[in-house]
């Protein structure tokens, strides 16, 4: 091969492709700027000429202190043509590091990007400004000689080494230092003839064309950047450059690479690629239609084929390569292409990926500890070659063909080389060898593990830092690590995440990993401690910052018992500003603007993780979403997140709708709408004519069924036919009816309206068909009772946990499910098929359940961003928003008489909102504590009930907000109040379920063995006195209640109580805690009077006999359940913490 210089390769390409785009710079927030090859060469030649005028004495190297920029290749080529080696200095590095390089390399001149001149290392040394090159945005400085004279004596030989090699015809291309992975950082001087073979060989291996777009993923201080720059520019391709801050924002980076630019070649460390996350990898980076042609891993051990396969979407055609090399023999020494067919196999082995073949002009040898060659077995890898020789530190000359020890231990097997780990990463425990890197790769190969780092602590404890795959089925989501709502006993595995306790599901995951390891490894190789973290921190070169992990672990172990301070906005803002400035190294008098972005303010991934840790310890906020807000949000976003965050996970992009379990997938399309809250974007709405003329039904949790717009209440298909066996709330006016009771009897009647006929046709499994109209028609023995079962009809992916409960809008044309998610999404789904009718992305998380306005045209829902949203039912457009003083988790309630919408807020108030006039009619302070629960309106007597976490239950006049009476408890009320004709009922955190008369007198108090977060479900029922309802001691009650109260408790039971006196009718023990609210409904289709549906937090849905509490059906879902079930016909809808909304069907077996 004829030796060439790097810039000569670019000149050859420019002569053939002068008018093609050579380099593009995309900031992600402004228009892309670019240079053609002709412009690149012209500006490079111009800079070279200016340097030759300004630098009188011939220099071996010129420093380059800059950020990524569209002119970056111009600056590099301009220096190389001088001729001189370029020495990159990182503005993000501490000034002392730059000073060390300057002194050790005896640097005399440095080019500094103009905007960095004031912040450069000149504060530590004396410099002289030689020239300013305005068109190149550079300033040339000279480092005064006294600085070099004061440097250490052992640094002196370097300058002569540079000159000597140039005189010998060995011009240097660049000078940099190693990352320290192979030991103490070394200064490496790389001749052109050492790096040019890399460029030429990879250009051939990758089959480069002028149509390619190569991403500059590496910083200039990391030698793979040389390959990226000149691989593109020697092929006539385009080099894509982005700001350093964008590289640290995975989602934004993916958008820039594959949406704004069609990147075809990506060379990166596995850790950097992992930061995209599985969803982005599958849907953008390695999707079926991805523009990415080449993905080359290097700088770290190649991920397992199992892991790479899990990142790829079916149909992806990206070629995967494994590159190996060391900076001491810059840059790559070997390459291996993963056969495409290997990634398509059903069962991929856990075998490591080979290092592959030597690069052009490269020799690779494996030697044992005595220096003998190894042809089979383990040994240390040595690399070199006649031309692959660099100068290290103070070396002046090196013999051609010198072989450098890499410090990497490999295994030779059938002529293939397999990486085992760094020589210093082969440790002994209990007299046995442990390959730390091999252990790390093995853990990463496990299902549900996205990334891992393994290290040995000073006290010889083997630590594994693990990042779980978000949304992995069958294992806790990475977000679950950060829940603090239902934590149990402390565990050391959570130290890097939070000083709080660890969820049981996380301990299960640890147990699963340990079990898998125990089947493959001896006990000495199994980690002593597993630390689950939201993301691995990176060095500036994109490698795992293991030292930072160890420091973080130790710091949080020491601080894990610290108490979080009071979260008032002023103190949190001040504390956050201080932490922000400390992490960025800013002066105390620096003002942190509300729109300041951490990464754009100079932060990096290590500093982001440090800020995450500091906030975790100082403020007790533990969500994985916290790290994402730090990476891609403003200071204001971060403050808002901390103030509102309590336990849930972060926002991730919504995945595609999952196919039905039992039916073929329906291809419903989503309508994504960005958040709009200002009045300028509020849109008028028109109530659909069918709902306006024929009425509609709203079904909510706790078996609340609202019927609107009827001349008379249809009795054939709705709840509680108004006969002597049922208690029905009075209708309001002639065309609005409210029934707050569940479907206990669904009978056909001549009074069924046209609306009812439409609904009957819509609901195939409606229980109205041929059912008896009174209890007398239901068999009293068991012969008519059919065995029941639950099956999944469909599920819809919301992108994050679903704690909200569904709300159903039953209209003549279809039944729509409305439900929100912690992903900020509100989905409108077709009940029959699960298709997404529309979807809105609101300003923050949604834990509130929705309500429908009295006109039927608006859906109202509260949001973590403090807003109450009123959206057009038909399309999701914003009609009005009302801002409260804090997070809104309370579910709104609609007054059937006035149409006012009542909702609570964490600011402690209840608001009466009029969506038609877009005004707040009144607001009421509930005595202290956030209003988490939902208000309850009762028509006769006309009263509104609201409760707070301060333990206050207030009875108000719904028209004016005037207090009628108050009830106080020593424990908070998370439970929402619900009413019967004579009483209001509520559960308390002290474990009590209380019945209170409408005049405020306590009627009874039932005690459970755990906190009650569940809300009471009130239903009408007449029990036969000759039928024993339960075998429990308290079931000997012979009174026939008009209403029953069904409620869950954290003691794991569902309780059914007599609403008159609070006596126990029956109780049922679930297998988990009961947070959700039961739903009581008709069982006529199955030969039963009533059924009760309830969910336990362990993921189980239960269907019980409403009269006896006997289990009739159950189904386990793959996630925790805090959402309450809602039933219409035979369909049950509920949200799950595995990100999905489920529709189940209750069928006969």
UniProtKB/Swiss-Prot annotation:
Q: Which GO terms describe its biological process?
A: amino acid activation for nonribosomal peptide biosynthetic process; fatty acid metabolic process
Q: What are this entry's molecular-function GO terms?
A: acid-thiol ligase activity; ATP binding
The residues the record assigns to binding ATP are: 178-186, 408, 422, 543
Q: O-(pantetheine 4'-phosphoryl)serine (modified residue): where? A: 605
Q: What class of enzyme is it?
A: ligase
**Where is the Carrier domain positioned along the sequence?**
570-646
Tell me the Pfam families matching this sequence.
AMP-binding, Beta-prop_ACSF4
Query: Which residues lie within the region annotated Disordered?
Result: 653-683
Query: What InterPro entries would the database entry show?
Result: AASDH_AMP, AMP-bd_C_sf, AMP-binding_CS, AMP-dep_synth/lig_dom, ANL_N_sf, Beta-ala_Activ/Resist, PP-bd_ACP, PQQ_b-propeller_rpt
Q: Which family does it belong to?
A: Belongs to the ATP-dependent AMP-binding enzyme family.
Under what name is this protein listed?
Beta-alanine-activating enzyme
């Amino acid at each position: 091969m004829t030796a060439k210089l790097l810039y000569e390769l670019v000149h050859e390409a420019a002569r053939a492709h002068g008018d093609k785009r050579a380099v593009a710079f995309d900031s992600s927030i402004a228009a892309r700027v670019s240079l053609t090859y002709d412009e690149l060469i012209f500006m490079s030649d111009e800079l070279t000429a200016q340097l030759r005028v300004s630098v009188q004495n011939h220099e071996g190297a010129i420093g380059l202190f800059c950020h990524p920029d569209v002119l970056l290749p111009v600056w590099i080529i301009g220096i190389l043509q001088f001729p001189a080696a370029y020495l990159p200095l990182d503005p993000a590095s501490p000034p002392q590091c730059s000073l060390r390089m300057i002194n050790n390399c005896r640097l005399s001149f440095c080019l500094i990007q103009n905007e960095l001149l004031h912040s450069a290392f000149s504060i530590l040394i004396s410099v002289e400004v030689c020239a300013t090159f305005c068109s190149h945005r550079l300033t040339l400085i000279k480092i005064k000689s006294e600085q070099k004279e004061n440097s250490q004596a052992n640094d002196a030989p370097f300058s002569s080494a540079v000159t000597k090699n140039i005189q010998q015809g060995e011009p240097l291309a660049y000078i940099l230092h190693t990352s320290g992975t192979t030991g103490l950082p070394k200064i490496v001087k790389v001749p052109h003839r050492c790096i040019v073979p890399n460029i030429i060989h990879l250009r051939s291996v990758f089959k480069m064309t002028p149509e390619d777009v190569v991403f500059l993923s590496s910083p200039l201080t990391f030698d793979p950047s040389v390959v990226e720059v000149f691989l593109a520019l020697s092929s006539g391709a385009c080099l894509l450059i982005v700001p350093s801050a964008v590289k640290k924002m995975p989602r934004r980076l993916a958008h820039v690479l594959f949406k704004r630019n069609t990147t075809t070649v990506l060379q990166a460390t596995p850790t950097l690629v992992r930061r995209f996350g599985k969803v982005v990898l599958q849907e953008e980076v390695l999707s079926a239609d991805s523009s990415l042609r080449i993905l080359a891993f290097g700088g770290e051990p190649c991920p397992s084929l199992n892991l790479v396969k899990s990142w790829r979407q079916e149909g992806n055609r990206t070629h995967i390569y494994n590159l190996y090399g060391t900076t001491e023999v810059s840059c790559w020494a070997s390459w291996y292409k993963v056969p495409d067919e290997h990634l398509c196999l059903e069962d991929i082995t856990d075998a490591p990926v080979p290092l592959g073949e030597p690069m052009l002009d490269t020799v690779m040898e494996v030697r044992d500890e005595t220096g003998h060659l190894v042809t089979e077995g383990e040994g240390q890898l040595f690399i070199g070659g006649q031309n692959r020789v660099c100068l290290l530190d103070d070396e002046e000359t090196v013999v051609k063909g010198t072989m450098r020890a890499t410090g990497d231990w490999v295994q030779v097997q059938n002529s293939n080389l397999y990486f085992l780990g760094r020589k210093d990463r082969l440790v002994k425990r209990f007299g046995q060898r442990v390959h730390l890197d091999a252990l790390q790769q093995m853990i990463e190969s496990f299902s549900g593990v996205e990334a891992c780092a393994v290290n040995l602590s000073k006290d010889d404890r083997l630590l594994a830092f693990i990042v779980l795959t978000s949304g992995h089925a069958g294992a806790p989501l990475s977000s679950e690590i950060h829940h603090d709502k239902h934590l149990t006993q402390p565990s050391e595995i959570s130290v890097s995440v939070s000083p709080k306790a660890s969820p049981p599901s996380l301990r299960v995951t640890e147990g699963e990993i340990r079990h898998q390891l125990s089947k493959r490894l001896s006990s000495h190789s199994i980690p002593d401690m597993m630390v689950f973290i939201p993301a691995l921190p990176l060095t500036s070169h994109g490698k795992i910052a293991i030292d930072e992990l160890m420091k973080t672990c130790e710091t949080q172990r020491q601080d894990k018992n610290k108490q979080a301070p009071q979260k008032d906005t002023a103190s949190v803002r001040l504390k956050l500003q201080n932490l922000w400035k400390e992490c960025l190294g800013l002066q105390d008098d620096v003002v942190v603007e509300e729109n300041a972005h951490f990464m754009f303010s100079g932060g990096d991934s290590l500093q982001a993780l440090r800020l995450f840790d500091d906030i975790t310890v100082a403020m007790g906020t533990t969500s994985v979403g916290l790290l994402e807000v730090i990476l891609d949000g403003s200071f204001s976003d971060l403050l808002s997140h901390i103030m509102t965050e309590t336990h849930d996970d972060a926002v991730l992009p919504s995945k595609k709708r999952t196919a039905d379990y039992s039916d073929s997938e329906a291809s419903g399309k989503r309508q994504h709408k960005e958040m709009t809250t200002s009045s300028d974007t509020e849109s008028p709405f028109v109530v659909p004519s069918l709902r306006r003329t024929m009425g509609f039904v709203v079904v909510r949790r706790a078996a609340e069924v609202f019927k609107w717009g009827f001349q008379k209440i249809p009795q054939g298909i709705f709840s509680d036919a108004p006969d002597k066996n049922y208690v029905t709330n009075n209708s309001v006016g002639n065309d609005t009816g409210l029934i707050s009771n569940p479907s206990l009897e669904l009978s056909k009647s001549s009074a069924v309206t046209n609306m009812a006929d439409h609904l009957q046709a819509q609901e195939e499994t409606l229980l109205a068909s041929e059912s008896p109209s009174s209890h007398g028609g239901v068999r009293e023995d068991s012969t008519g009772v059919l065995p029941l079962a639950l099956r999944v009809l469909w599920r819809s992916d919301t992108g994050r946990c679903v704690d909200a409960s569904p709300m159903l809008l039953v209209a003549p044309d279809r039944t729509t499910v409305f439900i929100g998610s912690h992903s900020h999404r509100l989905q409108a789904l077709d009940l029959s098929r699960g298709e997404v009718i529309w979807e809105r992305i609101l300003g923050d998380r949604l834990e509130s359940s929705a309500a429908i306005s009295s006109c039927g045209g608006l859906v109202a829902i509260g949001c973590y961003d403090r807003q109450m949203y009123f959206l057009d039912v038909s399309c999701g457009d914003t009609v009005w928003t009302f801002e409260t003083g804090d997070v809104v988790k309370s579910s709104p309630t609609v007054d059937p008489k006035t149409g006012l919408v009542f909702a609570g807020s964490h600011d402690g108030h209840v608001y009466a909102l009029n969506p038609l006039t877009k005004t707040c009619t009144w607001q009421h302070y509930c005595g202290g504590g956030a209003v988490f629960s939902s208000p309850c309106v009762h028509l006769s007597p006309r009263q509104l009930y609201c409760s707070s976490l301060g333990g206050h239950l207030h009875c108000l006049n719904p028209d004016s907000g005037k207090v009628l009476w108050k009830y106080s408890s020593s424990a908070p009320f998370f439970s929402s109040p619900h009413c019967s004709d004579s009483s209001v009922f509520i559960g308390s955190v002290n474990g009590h379920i209380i019945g209170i008369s409408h005049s405020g007198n306590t009627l009874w108090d039932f005690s459970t063995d755990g906190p009650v977060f569940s809300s009471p479900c009130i239903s009408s029922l007449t029990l036969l006195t000759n039928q024993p309802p339960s075998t429990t001691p308290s079931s000997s009650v012979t009174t026939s209640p008009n209403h029953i109260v069904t409620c869950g408790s954290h003691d794991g039971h569902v309780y059914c109580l007599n609403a008159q006196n609070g006596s126990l009718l029956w109780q049922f023990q679930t297998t988990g805690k009961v947070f959700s609210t039961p739903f009581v409904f008709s069982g006529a289709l199955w030969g039963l009077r009533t059924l009760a549906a309830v969910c336990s937090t362990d993921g189980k849905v239960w269907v019980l006999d409403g009269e006896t509490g006997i289990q009739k059906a159950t189904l386990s879902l793959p996630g925790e359940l805090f959402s309450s079930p809602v039933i219409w016909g035979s369909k049950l809808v509920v949200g799950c913490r595995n990100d999905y909304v489920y529709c189940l069907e209750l069928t006969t077996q």
